[in-house]
Amino acid sequence: YQRXSRYYYYXGPPDDIDDRY
């Protein structure tokens, strides 16, 4: 998890593929 992805912060399902990892 890099650059503060949603999954990293919210711990929820990755909504943005570009922001997933």
Curated annotation (Swiss-Prot):
Tissue specificity annotation: Component of conchiolin, the organic matrix of nacre. Is dispersed in calcium carbonate and also linked by disulfide bonds to the organic core of nacre.
Ranges where the record places region Disordered: 1-21
Keywords of the record: Disulfide bond, Extracellular matrix, Pharmaceutical, Secreted
Subcellular location: Secreted, Extracellular space, Extracellular matrix
Posttranslational mods: According to PubMed:11250534, amino acids 4 and 11 may be sulfated or phosphorylated. By similarity with the N14 matrix protein, amino-acid 4 may be a cysteine involved in a disulfide bond.
UniProt similarity note: Belongs to the N16 matrix protein family.
Name used for this protein in its record: Conchiolin protein p20
